[in-house]
């Protein structure tokens, strides 16, 4: 993928992830740490009980991180498939005897379309992630 197109995707995804982190993940981290500290405040509990308590505190955050990771992987996979399709089209054009400038123009245009298409998916992906994060029991 052309560097400028790759930077567009990377910047947009980073901005989305940073917003999710500030609005959702960070709050969940705070709850997890407070909950974990509370687990340690009971001197009568065994080491195993404290460990299980801390694990329960960590579960919502782990689930949230898994959701975000899974969604980002799916996004990356879709974008990769789109750009691979562009590469196949460019190879076919080159194999049919087209000159390099024509092949490059096709590739640049196709990859640009992939990037535009996938950047347009980010708002719905963000809404879906926010809804999923909000539905995780705390």
Curated annotation (Swiss-Prot):
Gene Ontology CC, one term: cytoplasm
Pfam families: DUF842
InterPro entries xrefs: DUF842_euk
Family to which the UniProt record says this protein belongs: Belongs to the FAM136 family.
PANTHER family listed in its UniProt record: PROTEIN FAM136A (PTHR21096:SF0)
Protein name, entry field: Protein FAM136A
Origin species: Danio rerio (Zebrafish)
């Amino acid at each position: 993928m052309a560097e400028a197109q790759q930077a567009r995707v990377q910047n947009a995804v980073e901005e989305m992830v940073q917003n999710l982190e500030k609005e959702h993940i960070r709050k969940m981290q705070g709850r997890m740490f407070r909950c974990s500290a509370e687990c340690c405040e009971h001197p009568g509990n065994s080491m195993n009980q404290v460990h299980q308590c801390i694990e329960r505190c960590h579960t919502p955050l782990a689930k949230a991180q898994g959701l975000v990771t899974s969604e980002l992987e799916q996004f990356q996979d879709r974008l990769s498939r789109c750009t691979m399709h562009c590469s196949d089209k460019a190879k076919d054009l080159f194999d049919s005897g087209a000159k390099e400038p024509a092949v490059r123009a096709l590739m640049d245009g196709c990859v640009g379309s992939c990037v535009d298409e996938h950047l347009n998916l980010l708002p719905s992906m963000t809404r879906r992630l926010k809804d999923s994060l909000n539905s995780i029991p705390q």
